[in-house]
């Protein structure tokens, strides 16, 4: 049921919150996701494991993409792999993506470390007092540029996907 879904998501994803009073998922969000074709309707008000997996994808995507872009990305998957009696389903997709992401953690850590080191070697001609703040700013700019470029690429790729039927 919806209350169980919001509680479960809050418990599982609370470590990703920036502020303690941030909400991971609300009933209104779930209703909006269903209304915007991101989430298939529940079966007699009951949500399945696959609903939770789709909600996890939505949770991560919504920080980068518009609701429309998320629909373009997820609708073909939910149409083809949601609640199917097949070995390959939403859970298979989720597991494969998680495995791929976990395999990249070291690479991402190295990339972040390199961005930090680059920033650490910037503003060497500035007084010590100001240098630390400017280096932190440079580090944030470096990370932001990385996110910006990747977001642009993601949006371009989404724009090239077929638009889902209503």
Model-predicted regions and their roles:
Residues 80-166:
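Intrinsically disordered, low-complexity, charge-dense segments enriched in Lys/Arg
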Residues 1-81:
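Basic helix-turn-helix/winged-helix DNA-binding cores
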